[in-house]
Amino acid sequence: MYITNDEFRVFYVRIVRFSASSKLSSMKKELFETRQLMNMTSAQDEFSKWAKLRRRVDKLSSQVDEQNKSLASSQFVYSIMFKSFMFVLNSAIPFVLNWYYKRVPMFYLPPGDWFGPMGYLFSFPNAPAGAVSSTVWTTVCGRVLALVGEYARELFVKDAYLVAEPPMTTEKSSGDKETTSKLSTNKPAAMTGEKFDFGKEVKEADQPQGILKQRRANKSSD
């Protein structure tokens, strides 16, 4: 049984340290909201409020860093213990059992020389002739389970993908047309590196739609 690092991380965060991960998520959310509020506050006009928010942001940032370090260290220790347990369960115990029952057949093949020299391989290492040994049987079962697990991952685990939008055509005042291609990644402006003007968005949201359309038409014509 093979478990990837991402699967182990999901298992550890959601089950083993669920309370700590929930606390970390709430702290990150509070930090994001406080930082947004601080960016909306003018440091010159409302310095006392801005300074208070700044201290709150610094405090939350330090708490988030400490919580991340705590989770990372505990995850490292737990991963070593978990991998040791899985090694004993998947490798050490089957090896001991196969060695102890190496002469005991799992079942016998149909009588006859159907398999030829393969019959000796089925009885490896010390099972009676014409039988399937425990070593071969556990190896085949483990391989089948591994293949089923890989097919299940490919079937149920889907990768994220980018959605391409159709080309947009913009008309100029001279009558010429300009075609541009836009790729939508569904990411916020902070992740794409674009400058986000919150005050502009608030002002535009408060104005009627007709005025907004007229202003956008004037900008496109310019």
From Swiss-Prot:
The record's similarity note reads:
Belongs to the WRB/GET1 family.
Q: Where in the cell is it found?
A: Endoplasmic reticulum membrane
Biased amino acid composition, Basic and acidic residues: 194-206
* Keyword annotations from UniProtKB, A to Z: Coiled coil, Endoplasmic reticulum, Membrane, Transmembrane, Transmembrane helix, Transport
Task: Give the superkingdom in one word.
Answer: Eukaryota
Where does the record place the region Disordered?
Answer: 168-222
The residue spans the entry assigns to the Cytoplasmic side of the membrane are as follows 1-86, 149-222
The protein's name in its UniProt record: Protein GET1
GO terms classed as biological process = tail-anchored membrane protein insertion into ER membrane
Q: From which residue to which does the signal peptide run?
A: none
Q: How does it sit in the membrane?
A: Multi-pass membrane protein
Q: Which GO terms describe its cellular component?
A: endoplasmic reticulum membrane; GET complex
Output compositional bias ranges, type Basic residues: 213-222
Residue ranges the record marks as coiled coil: 48-75
Q: Which gene encodes it?
A: GET1
Q: Which GO terms describe its molecular function?
A: protein-membrane adaptor activity
Q: In UniProt terms, what function does this protein have?
A: Required for the post-translational delivery of tail-anchored (TA) proteins to the endoplasmic reticulum. Acts as a membrane receptor for soluble GET3, which recognizes and selectively binds the transmembrane domain of TA proteins in the cytosol.
Originating species: Malassezia globosa (strain ATCC MYA-4612 / CBS 7966) (Dandruff-associated fungus)
Assembly: Interacts with GET3.
* Residue intervals passing through the bilayer: 87-107, 132-148
